[in-house]
């Protein structure tokens, strides 16, 4: 029986945002966001679920549109949660069997979705 395997990569982007109506984060400020993505699938004959380079390329295509931008221009309320949901959705639309996406604003604040 073939087992399902989980693989993952991490990448990052820098961006600014403000959270409308938030007392502290309502002003434009920036973060160096870290993004972690995990996908799952069967190990193919080549010994891989997916080539890490291909996975990183696809994730970077999605994340690149956020790099060095004002996130409010792309996501109405650009919380870490909504950024995470957007990345998850766009990766799923590209046909990846996404298991987990984590978006971290810094070392001690992040949002994560798992399926």
UniProtKB/Swiss-Prot annotation:
Disulfide bonds: none annotated. One of its GO terms (molecular function) is metal ion binding. Binds 1 zinc ion per subunit. InterPro entries: 6-PTP_synth/QueD, 6-PTP_synth/QueD_sf. SUPFAM superfamilies: Tetrahydrobiopterin biosynthesis enzymes-like. Keywords: Lyase, Metal-binding, Zinc. Pathway: Purine metabolism; 7-cyano-7-deazaguanine biosynthesis. Its EC number is 4.1.2.50. Zn(2+) binds at residues 17, 29, 31. It holds the Pfam family PTPS. It catalyses: 7,8-dihydroneopterin 3'-triphosphate + H2O = 6-carboxy-5,6,7,8-tetrahydropterin + triphosphate + acetaldehyde + 2 H(+). Its cofactor is Zn(2+). The active site is at 25 (proton acceptor), 68 (charge relay system), 105 (charge relay system). The active site is at the interface between 2 subunits. The proton acceptor Cys is on one subunit, and the charge relay system is on the other subunit. Catalyzes the conversion of 7,8-dihydroneopterin triphosphate (H2NTP) to 6-carboxy-5,6,7,8-tetrahydropterin (CPH4) and acetaldehyde. Belongs to the PTPS family. QueD subfamily. This is Putative 6-carboxy-5,6,7,8-tetrahydropterin synthase. The gene is queD.
């Amino acid at each position: 029986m073939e087992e399902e395997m989980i693989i993952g990569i991490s990448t990052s982007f820098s961006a600014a945002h403000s959270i409308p109506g938030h007392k502290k984060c309502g002003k434009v400020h920036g973060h160096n966001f870290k993004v972690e993505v995990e996908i799952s699938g069967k190990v193919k004959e080549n010994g891989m679920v997916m080539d890490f380079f291909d996975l990183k390329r696809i994730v970077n295509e999605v994340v690149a549109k956020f790099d060095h931008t004002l996130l409010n221009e792309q996501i109405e309320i650009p919380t870490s949660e909504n950024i995470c949901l957007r990345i998850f959705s766009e990766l799923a639309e590209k046909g990846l069997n996404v298991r987990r996406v984590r978006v971290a604003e810094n070392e001690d604040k992040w949002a994560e979705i798992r399926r």
